[in-house]
A protein has these predicted regions:
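Short catalytic/metal-binding and nucleic-acid-binding patches
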Residues: 1-181
Length: 181
C-alpha cells in the first residue's frame, strides 16, 4: 500500500507573472536557520555610528562584520545586476541566518523597451543561491524563499526602511534563533 506524501503549498501567486516590471521583497534563509553570515551574532549598535535619517533624527547603526560566507553572499548580491539586464538591487541586508533583498525589475531602460525579457524572480534567486554555493563549495540555503510583491509607494518605503533597520533589530526578528551556548 502506497502512502501519499503531503503536497507542498505553492509559495508564489498562481496567476502572477514574476518577470514583469515591479518591486519585490525577497527573503532567503540559511538551512536550518544556521547563524553563519555574521562574524558576531550578538551585535549591539556601535558607538558613533548614528545615521542621519532627516528632521534632526539620528538612528544608531549596527555595523555587522560579515563572516567568510557572509562576504561571499554580499559579493553575489552585488553581482546580480550584471547577470540580468533591467534588474536592480535597490536595498539589501545580510543577516546572521537570512538575506533580505529589495529587487526592482524594469522592462524599460533609458526610455526604451528592452529587447530581452527579464528573468523571473525565481530564476534570479536560483542563480544567486547557485553562485554562493559554487563559491563556498557547498549549499547553505534552505529550499525556496519568501517573496512579497510590492504594489504601492508606501509599501516600498516601509520595506526599504525595514531592511535598513533590520540589523539593529536582529534580536526582535522573526528569524532570530538564540545561539547555542
Amino acid at each position: 500500500m502506497e502512502t501519499e506524501l503531503p503536497k507542498r503549498k505553492a509559495n508564489r501567486l498562481p496567476t502572477y507573472d514574476y518577470a514583469q516590471s515591479g518591486a519585490y521583497f525577497i527573503t532567503i534563509c540559511t538551512r536550518e536557520r544556521q547563524q553563519i553570515l555574521w562574524a558576531d551574532n550578538d551585535l549591539k549598535p556601535a558607538a558613533n555610528t548614528d545615521k542621519n535619517v532627516g528632521a534632526s533624527i539620528a538612528r544608531p547603526q549596527v555595523v555587522a562584520p560579515l563572516s567568510k560566507p557572509g562576504k561571499i553572499v554580499e559579493q553575489c548580491i552585488l553581482q546580480i545586476p550584471s547577470h540580468y539586464q533591467g534588474v536592480l538591487v535597490e536595498k539589501y541586508a545580510v543577516m546572521p541566518n537570512h538575506v533580505h533583498l529589495l529587487l526592482l525589475l524594469q522592462s524599460w531602460q533609458d526610455g526604451r523597451a528592452m529587447l530581452a525579457p527579464t528573468a523571473t524572480i525565481s530564476q534570479i534567486v536560483q542563480q544567486f543561491k547557485g553562485a554562493v554555493t559554487k563559491n563556498l563549495g557547498h549549499s547553505i540555503w534552505q529550499k525556496s524563499f519568501h517573496d512579497h510583491v510590492i504594489r504601492t509607494r508606501y509599501g516600498f518605503e516601509m520595506i526599504w526602511q525595514y531592511i535598513d533597520i533590520n540589523p539593529q533589530n536582529w534580536h526582535k526578528d522573526c528569524f532570530y534563533k538564540e545561539p547555542p551556548p
